[in-house]
Curated annotation (Swiss-Prot):
Residues the record lists as binding Zn(2+) 2: 285, 288, 309, 314
Segments for region (Disordered): 207-232, 333-383
Species this chain originates from: Homo sapiens
GO BP of this protein: blastocyst hatching; negative regulation of DNA-templated transcription; negative regulation of muscle cell differentiation; negative regulation of transcription by RNA polymerase II; regulation of insulin secretion involved in cellular response to glucose stimulus; regulation of transcription by RNA polymerase II
Record SUPFAM superfamilies: beta-beta-alpha zinc fingers (SSF57667), Hermes dimerisation domain (SSF140996), Ribonuclease H-like (SSF53098)
Name of this chain's protein: Zinc finger BED domain-containing protein 6
A single GO molecular function term of this UniProt record: DNA-binding transcription repressor activity, RNA polymerase II-specific
Binding site for Zn(2+) 1: 151, 154, 175, 180
Residue ranges covered by zinc fingers (BED-type): 130-187, 264-321
Keyword Cell cycle: no
Length: 979
């Protein structure tokens, strides 16, 4: 326990009165303390007041002294609180109030009130106990609420327990694992020694690191050398990639010496164990994944229990390790030493391969019978028979719970239900479910709720993150795209979602099986909770963190970022130097919502329609009457469609449902009071549905995987043509009200600010140019005043930039160059490269270097020739769907530079339909459901739900293990907590 000193000036009170005042409070010590002041101003002798008035025994002349004199000079005494403090901070007044007591005007009241308040109110100073946990390098105690700690990275206040109870660090560890997993993993890997300097995360990234400990992405020039590093410096980055790739794995990896400041681990047991990153007083076995205690926290942590675990559970491994440890000294043959190396390599193989365990059967196949007998004799001798039997029975229970394949499959299925169906953790702890499991699998022991929350789901979360990270390592294109969404489903929290999109042209087997290939890939990088009042800097910082975490280690560069028109998000993207593309679906939604608000008749009709649907959805009797009427008249029945606030498509489906059941609804509403839809409103509802029908079709086209920026201009053109046809139809029929509605919506569609910006944006126009389906009818899609030749020059500049940055990709292989069908349409730039080839047909390296270092004016005519050749080629429809990437996959060897530019523009999505499907159609993400789950863990669950089907994760590869005895203790404690 560390000692905290408080300097208190001596007042006019006599020592006797002061000791009488302090005698009822506890033990007061005055000891010499070294300080920066003069030696004469420090107390050199110890005086202890133990609750007995010793001043009564002193001579009267000493009582008349105004202060304490030592060696003839007046001193200032140092009061030291020797009363035993609690190991954690109490719930009393914050420590920050102590200096205020010292600054009081009355010295006598200062000394008495300070000491009494520290003893009676139990104000525990922060330095009363050394913080040995590594989490304290990322947290500091909240000065206002001492039972909470503030994260140094995100400044979030995290609770450590209830006031007055034990304050631990488990919640702080879970916060670091969920919100700052790279920082926490690398801290465990490299360590922070007690008493050393503060730990700083040293991550080698192409982006620069911010001063606040998080990543700051700085976009570079397109022709910068960093963008060419993926091709030129790939060998030099292998070490960085291997090191950064391991940040995702916090389990199933042998981590030696996780806790810094400890002595070197010389015991042989550490070849079979690694320190548990969540509980430093426990160690995890590399063979069976069981967590074994090394002692009580805060006491001496030995290896005796680890040795007993190896002797009882893995006697063969332990005996061979003991035998091999003396191989050199005893002069054993080389075969024995090689077997030792093989065993050691097998045990440590989990660092790179996962979980390949060496069992006793594997050793028995390779070793003779005599060493086996010797091993058994050596393993039985060190421990008593009774203790060995107890450990063996515990191992049998663990094998029954974890080693049984059926039990593993059941546990994996439960985790799958938690993630995919968003079941709460306590659902599997209910008596009904436990009775069901007793009938289905009597021998299965259900893990505790805490196990699923703290071990199973985080382990699955890490595995999926690792798989996504390894997939991004193999992305061929250097430029990828991001979609950013913020969804509000919590009273105090918004969820920040970042999704990455890229293209992989390696899927070439569709010609054999006849299926359309899926070139477009995507993955959710993060689901992070942000405060409602988060600033632009917080959003930009989180975006830079994700880019530095996922993209920069793989030399990937964000080309376009798609988001809605939220002011904070748009400003954050632009302030970061990124290219922002508005979400097409959000633009349509804003146009139609403004159209609804502009017409009062439509608003009144929607209010009546919502009341009608609410009447049938909340009244069982009304719903039964409606269904009976449908059955009596043999009318088809469809489920009721509810309207969602802020989404026009749900409003359209609600109106469409009412029109399909208009006869039944009108008949049923006659019996209900207060719910009426007039005939004029029914007619207006028909007009609105006819007008919105083209927009619903456009939404369906946008929500498919193959939709990209190439369809923005054609879809807007198609919507305007559809509204024009509707206007002509209404004009022929003489419906004035419908004509006014069509004209109003057409005007809004043409004058909308966001849509007008998208029509004139360079990414959308170039993406349309690179779609072979639209290249022959571009004049119909282009806005007024746009020049086609100007945008062809822009496209040629993009091709020229790519030729200059990646000249080696623009070469044609020798085998392909010899084919006449390929060389006919080859790049002019590639043809110039071929002129520098030698007689043997190989490309001259000096010629390639000269071209690569040539001026941009030399490459631009070649790029223009490639673009002209693309537009002159006649495009014919082919069987393969509407995805233009199928066309460009066939042209990658003919126009390599133009193909790469086409992939860059065609791979950008029009909207973020992935998060749309999760948050708008899935009822599991209601605010009540989210608030009932843990905040840090709900982010992991949403991340898994959005990624598991996309990455095709195999649950059978998830290795699960738990301690049955500890599981029973946790389950019993959970039952006591539950009402």
């Amino acid at each position: 326990m560390s000692v905290c000193t408080l300097s208190v000036p001596v007042s006019s009170l006599s020592p006797g009165r002061r000791c009488n005042t302090f005698s009822d409070s506890g033990i007061l010590g005055c000891v010499p303390i070294n300080s920066n002041t003069d030696e004469e101003d420090v107390v050199e002798e110890k005086m202890v007041a133990e609750g007995v008035n010793k001043e009564a025994k002193q001579p009267a002349k000493k009582k008349r002294k105004k202060g304490l004199r030592i060696k003839g000079k007046r001193r200032r005494k140092k009061l030291i609180l020797a009363k035993k403090f609690s190991k954690d901070l109490g719930s009393g007044r914050p420590v920050a109030d102590a200096p205020a007591l010292l600054a009081s005007n009355d010295p006598e009241q200062d000394e008495e009130s300070l000491f009494e308040s520290n003893i009676e109110k139990q104000i525990y100073l922060p330095s009363t106990r050394a913080k040995t946990s590594i989490v304290w390098h990322f947290f500091h105690v909240d000065p206002q609420y001492t039972w909470r700690a503030i994260c140094n990275l995100c400044e979030k206040s995290v609770s450590r327990g209830k006031p007055g109870s034990h304050l631990g660090t488990s919640t702080l560890q879970r916060h670091l694992q969920a919100r700052h997993s790279p920082h926490w993993t690398r801290a465990n890997k490299f360590g922070v020694a007690s008493g050393e300097e503060d730990f700083t995360l040293d991550v080698s990234l192409s982006p620069s690191s911010g001063s606040n400990g998080s990543f700051e992405y700085i976009p570079t020039d397109p022709l910068d050398d960093n963008r060419m590093g993926k091709k030129h410096d790939k060998s030099a980055s292998d070490a960085l990639r291997a090191e950064r790739g391991r940040f995702l794995i916090k389990s199933n990896i042998v981590k030696h010496a996780l806790i810094p400041g400890t002595r070197a681990k010389t015991s042989a047991v550490w070849n079979f164990f690694y320190t548990d990153p969540q509980h430093i007083s426990r160690a995890v076995c590399n063979i069976c994944k069981r967590s074994v205690s090394r002692g009580r926290p805060g006491s001496h942590l030995g290896t005796s229990t680890l040795q007993r675990h190896l002797q009882a559970t893995h006697p063969i491994h332990w005996a061979v390790a003991n035998k091999d440890s003396g191989a050199v000294a005893n002069g054993l043959d080389e075969a024995e030493t090689e077997r030792s190396d093989l065993l050691s390599d097998t045990l440590h193989g989990e660092k790179s391969t996962g979980s390949q365990d060496l069992t006793a059967e594997d050793l028995s196949d390779s070793d003779s019978d005599e060493p086996m007998l010797e091993v058994e004799n050596r393993s039985e001798s060190p421990i008593p028979v009774a203790e060995q039997g107890t450990l063996m029975r515990a191992q049998e229970r663990e094998t029954t719970c974890c080693g049984n394949p059926v039990s593993s499959h059941i546990s994996q299925a439960i985790i799958q239900m938690i993630v995919e169906d968003m079941h709460p953790y306590n659902y599997f702890s209910t008596p009904a479910f436990q009775r069901f499991m007793q009938i289905v699998a009597p021998d299965y022991r259900l893990p505790s709720e805490t196990y699923f929350f703290t071990k199973a789901v985080p382990q699955l979360y890490d595995c999926v993150r690792e798989k996504i990270f390894l997939t991004l390592e193999n992305v061929q294109s250097q430029k990828i795209h991001l979609t950013v969404d913020i969804w509000t489903h919590d009273p105090s929290t918004d969820y920040f979602i970042v999704t990455v999109h890229w293209v992989s042209l390696e899927t070439a087997s569709f010609l054999n099986n006849g299926r359309i290939p899926d070139f477009r890939k995507w993955a959710v990088l993060c689901v992070t909770g942000l405060a409602k009042d988060c600033l632009i800097t917080n959003i930009l910082q989180e975006l830079n963190d994700q880019i530095g975490l996922w993209l920069s280690p793989n030399f990937l560069i964000p080309s376009f970022i798609v988001s809605d028109n939220s002011s904070n998000v748009v400003h954050a993207i632009k302030d970061g130097g990124f290219t922002h593309v508005p979400c097409f679906l959000h633009c349509l939604n804003m146009v139609i919502q403004d159209f609804f608000c502009e017409h009062k008749s439509i608003e009144n009709m929607l209010v009546a329609a919502r009341k009608t649907c609410h009447h049938f959805s909340h009244s069982v009797k009304a719903r039964q009457i409606l269904q009976e009427f449908q059955n009596d008249h043999q009318l088809p029945w469809k489920n009721l469609k509810q309207d969602e606030t802020g989404h026009w498509i749900s409003t359209f489906y609600m109106l469409k449902w009412l029109l399909e059941h208009c006869y039944s609804v009108h008949h049923s509403l006659g019996r209900a009071s207060g719910v009426v839809l007039t005939s004029l409103q029914w007619t207006l509802m028909t007009y609105v549905c006819d007008i919105l029908k083209p927009f619903e079709e456009a939404t369906q086209k946008v929500s498919v995987k193959t939709a990209g920026l190439n369809q923005v201009l054609p879809l807007i053109h198609h919507l305007l043509l559809s509204l024009q046809k509707l206007r002509e139809d209404f004009q022929v029929r003489g419906i004035t009200q419908a004509l006014n509605l069509v004209d109003s919506l057409s005007l809004k569609l043409e004058t909308d600010t966001l849509l007008s910006a998208m029509l004139k944006s360079k990414p959308c126009i170039l993406a349309t140019l690179l779609d072979p389906c639209f290249k022959n009818s571009l004049e119909d899609f282009f806005p007024q005043g746009a020049d086609l030749e100007t945008y062809k020059q822009f496209l040629a500049e993009e091709v020229c930039n790519y030729m200059e940055s990646s000249p080696e990709i623009c070469q044609i292989p020798t085998s392909e160059a010899s084919c006449p069908s390929v060389t006919v349409g080859a790049d002019s730039f590639t043809s110039s490269l071929k002129e520098g080839t030698s007689s043997s047909g190989s490309v001259d390296s000096s010629a390639v270097d000269n071209v690569a270092l040539g001026s941009k004016s030399f490459m631009f005519p070649s790029a223009v020739a490639v673009v002209d050749e693309y537009f002159k080629e006649k495009y014919s429809e082919f069987s393969g769907g509407d995805d233009p990437l199928i066309y460009w996959q066939r042209k990658i060897s003919i126009w390599p530079a133009l193909t790469q530019v086409a992939i860059q523009y065609l791979s950008c999505p029009m909207c973020s339909w992935q998060s749309e499907c999760i948050f708008t159609k899935n009822s599991h993400f209601h605010p009540k459901q989210i608030m009932s789950l843990d905040f840090d863990n709900i982010e992991q669950l949403m991340f898994l739900k959005m990624n598991l089907k996309n990455v095709n994760y195999d649950y059978s590869t998830l290795v699960l293990s738990w301690d049955p005895e500890q599981n029973e203790v946790v389950q019993s404690s959970e039952k006591e907590i539950l009402p």
